[in-house]
Amino acid sequence: MASEFKKKLFWRAVVAEFLAMILFIFISIGSALGFHYPIKSNQTTGAVQDNVKVSLAFGLSIATLAQSVGHISGAHLNPAVTLGLLLSCQISILRAIMYIIAQCVGAIVATVILSGITSSLPDNSLGLNALAPGVNSGQGLGIEIIGTLQLVLCVLATTDRRRRRDLGDSGPLAIGFSVALGHLLAIDYTGCGINPARSFGSSVITHNFQDHWIFWVGPFIGAALAVLIYDFILAPRSSDLTDRVKVWTSGQVEEYDLDADDINSRVEMKPK
């Protein structure tokens, strides 16, 4: 673990997660807040939000950023995805911790920027996730679990090294579609979290943590279930416990060169 900590590529990856998260939150949440602005001078604010447009903004931004920084950090951009890859023994514990910190800080920074740009909006929630009227905490939790499960399942399948020849370069696009699909499912029920860092940034800046636990517990349960389903039922991995522990402590041996800053030894969100 200490060996990975000393490498420049490790810190480049952490910075990549931080910067990409800022862009992701700014683009995606900004697209949702934009519906409150009038397009013409005779229109009033408070237009009906177009769920399809917002879902596509979230999905396409993930697909674009996965292509942009996937070769540097893997472009997780989501603590639930990071947890899933950790439980799947594809990244080290240290990398997972630093990624989640970078993602959360990046989300906060992006939300602060959005807060300044959209300060004239009345009742600006900054994309705060909340349960819709009539949706209880159990139902909201279930929606978040299912939405995240399908996302992490897609990530595990598209980043499976055994499938690289089959997938080509379509991995980021598939993951982007999965994010959009999750929003089409969940946006009317919970505002669609499926990303604890995205939910955390809005809650911190608005000082509103009502039902916030749902947007951490749900995605983490969904991620764990996705790993259980993919790694132990659909596509079992042959690596033994010793190899898995080595990954947790030292990183993915096949993907990371821990003894030299080899520019080619990176894990990618897209197949190589």
From Swiss-Prot:
- Motif (NPA 1) on chain: 78-80
Instruction: Kindly list the places in or outside the cell where this protein is found, as annotated in its UniProt entry.
Output: Cell membrane
Residue ranges, Cytoplasmic compartment?
1-11, 68-70, 85-92, 156-166, 228-272
NPA 2 (motif): residue ranges: 195-197
Q: Which residues carry this modification: Phosphoserine?
A: S250, S265
| Gene3D superfamilies hit by this protein | Glycerol uptake facilitator protein
Q: Name one GO molecular function term.
A: potassium channel activity
Catalytic activity reads:
H2O(in) = H2O(out); nitric oxide(out) = nitric oxide(in); CO2(out) = CO2(in); glycerol(in) = glycerol(out)
Phosphotyrosine modification sites are Y256
Q: Which residues lie within the membrane without crossing it?
A: 71-84, 190-202
Signal peptide range equals none
Q: Which Pfam families match?
A: MIP (PF00230)
Source domain of life is Eukaryota
Describe tissue expression: Detected in fetal kidney (at protein level). Detected in fetal kidney.
Per UniProt, which keywords does this protein have?
Cell membrane, Glycoprotein, Membrane, Phosphoprotein, Repeat, Transmembrane, Transmembrane helix, Transport
Q: Which residues lie on this side of the membrane: Extracellular?
A: 30-48, 112-135, 185-189, 203-209
The membrane-spanning stretches of this chain are 12-29, 49-67, 93-111, 136-155, 167-184, 210-227
Q: Which residues are glycosylated?
A: N42
Complex and partners? Homotetramer; each monomer provides an independent water pore. Component of the ankyrin-1 complex in the erythrocyte, composed of ANK1, RHCE, RHAG, SLC4A1, EPB42, GYPA, GYPB and AQP1. Interacts with EPHB2; involved in endolymph production in the inner ear. Identified in a complex with STOM. Interacts (via the N-terminal) with ANK1 (via ANK 1-5 repeats). Interacts (via the C-terminal) with EPB42.
Q: What does this protein do?
A: Forms a water channel that facilitates the transport of water across cell membranes, playing a crucial role in water homeostasis in various tissues. Could also be permeable to small solutes including hydrogen peroxide, glycerol and gases such as amonnia (NH3), nitric oxide (NO) and carbon dioxide (CO2). Recruited to the ankyrin-1 complex, a multiprotein complex of the erythrocyte membrane, it could be part of a CO2 metabolon, linking facilitated diffusion of CO2 across the membrane, anion exchange of Cl(-)/HCO3(-) and interconversion of dissolved CO2 and carbonic acid in the cytosol.
The Swiss-Prot or TrEMBL record describes its family as follows: Belongs to the MIP/aquaporin (TC 1.A.8) family.
The protein depicted here goes by the name: Aquaporin-1
